[in-house]
A protein has these predicted regions:
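Generic hydrophobic transmembrane alpha-helix motif, especially the helices
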Residues: 98-134, 141-142
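Short cytoplasmic-facing helical segments at TM-TM junctions of multi-pass membrane proteins
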Residues: 142-183, 204, 208
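Glycine-rich helix-loop "coupling/hinge" segments at transmembrane-helix boundaries
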Residues: 114, 143, 190-227, 246-256
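C-terminal transmembrane helix and the adjacent membrane-cytosol boundary/short C-terminal tail
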Residues: 87, 175, 179, 221-257
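N-terminal signal-anchor transmembrane alpha helix
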Residues: 2-28
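Transmembrane alpha-helices
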Residues: 125, 129, 161-195, 222, ...
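Periplasmic/extracellular loop-to-transmembrane helix junction in inner-membrane transport proteins
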Residues: 2, 25-73
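Transmembrane-helix boundary motif in ABC transporter permease subunits
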Residues: 68-97
């Protein structure tokens, strides 16, 4: 296993070990009410209690998050490329998006519920709306600030603007696009949980809310860990795809080890 992977997974194992030891010490010394800080064993037991509903919760939440993320990714990359490569599109579209972008996405959640109801559509569109902006901004910046010398050289040698875009602008913007996709994925899960906490009868966020009503902190932590693990897996998949697409890009010193 590469050295960096050992360090990464070792840090996670160390954090879990510290949590476990602190829980054991706290149970003996009663520094804090043990019900408020369950141990990893308590959390695993809570997950086992929910074993019959967890698969469905994961499937429902994943479907919502991925549907919203897919919409955001398509629109964000397309509009980012359009505004980054066209001054007219930039002048017309970008000011409107920049006006909306500073508003916290959750401020629109009540509006989306009124417009689209409490069903799946409002949650999926809310996720798409929240993830769109980070994807758009990163794509726009990557395309807009592609190497101007290479662009001028390509155009002076007779390349069309379309060809220059696909051979220079888009490849050079790919790292920024993937940065936006990773941030968008994180935003998707953030808004997903918030939406499920407020207006859902299934999903991982709803299960956390149900645990709050029951004052089951062990189940609440289990739900949070569950979301973190799924997010980590999805981020790793995105990182793997990015590494394959950017195999041509020089790596930083020591990155491959």
């Amino acid at each position: 296993m590469p050295k960096r992977s050992l360090i990464r997974y070792g840090s996670i194992a160390g954090a879990v070990a510290f949590w476990f030891l602190f829980g054991l010490v706290n149970e003996q010394l009663q520094l804090i009410n043990p019900a408020m800080i369950p141990t990893p064993v308590d959390v695993v037991e809570a997950g086992w209690e929910l074993r019959n509903v967890v698969p469905l919760d994961i499937a429902v939440s994943l479907l919502r998050a991925l549907e919203g993320f897919a919409i955001a990714a398509v629109l964000g990359v397309l509009l980012g490329c359009l505004c980054g490569s066209s001054r007219i599109a930039e002048d017309v579209i970008d000011p409107i998006l920049e006006l909306i972008r500073p508003i916290p996405p959750l401020a629109f959640l009540p509006i989306f519920i009124i417009w689209f109801g409490l069903g799946e559509l409002s949650k999926v569109l809310m996720i798409a709306f929240s993830a769109f902006f980070v994807i758009y901004v990163n794509t726009y910046q990557g395309v807009r600030y592609a190497d101007p010398l290479l662009m001028r050289a390509a155009l002076s040698l007779g390349a069309s603007r379309r060809r220059a875009f696909f051979t220079i602008s888009l490849p050079s913007a790919t790292p920024e696009i993937f940065t936006g996709l990773r941030l968008g994925m994180g935003m998707s899960f953030f808004v997903l949980v918030a939406a499920e906490l407020l207006a859902a009868d299934s999903g991982m966020g709803f299960r956390i809310q149900e645990a709050r009503w029951q004052f089951r902190i062990d189940r609440m932590i289990y739900g949070a860990v569950e979301i973190g693990i799924i997010g980590f897996i999805l981020f790793s998949l995105l990182h793997s795809i990015e590494a394959r697409l950017l195999a041509w890009k020089p790596k930083r010193e020591g990155e491959a080890s």
